[in-house]
Amino acid sequence: MSRTRQIPSEPASSSQLELTEEHTETSSAVPVPATLRLRGADEPAANRLELNEGNSRRIRWSEDVIDNEGMGKKSSKVCCIYHKSRPIGDSSSESESSDSSTSNSDTDSDDEAACHRRTGHRPPTAQGENYASSGQRLSSNSEERTCRSSHRARKTKRKPSPNAYEKMPKTTKGR
């Protein structure tokens, strides 16, 4: 085995270093197989009882979480907030108070803004722009401004660009 140490020759000068090497050889170097076992920290007695009864710790998804195509991959992220269409005379506060999955209006507007950033759609404004040319449909209720576009419609299909493996490297002059 070889060790290398760097020892400064003078404490005031950091530019001069003295290198010394020590060689230590051992003739009986036998590798020892080892097993590392990891255990969690001690848990309170109540948690240990739950684990022993067969209730192992696992993620419990709520009923409104979507199972992506039945593959066991669940996700709670959604692009747009879906609001059921209501008759014109209904109060929006009654239906929202009974629905536990709806959130406050600040979160809705944040989710809506994120939807528009991801999809490239312009959000509706308070001036009443309807963006009919871009294919978006807005609801007649000014409080309910959600993105109801198809998200899949593109005006023109562009020619696919080559990926990194298909591009030729740029040559630089002088090399």
Curated annotation (Swiss-Prot):
Residues 148-160 have a biased composition (Basic residues). Residues 90-106 have a biased composition (Low complexity). Its main location: nucleus. Residues 127-141 have a biased composition (Polar residues). Residues 1-175 are annotated as: Disordered. One of its GO terms (molecular function) is protein phosphatase 1 binding. Keywords: Nucleus. It is found in: Nucleus. GO terms for cellular component: nucleus. It comes from the Eukaryota. Regulator of type 1 phosphatases which maintains protein phosphatase activity under strict control. Belongs to the YPI1 family. This is Type 1 phosphatases regulator ypi1. It comes from Aspergillus niger (strain ATCC MYA-4892 / CBS 513.88 / FGSC A1513).
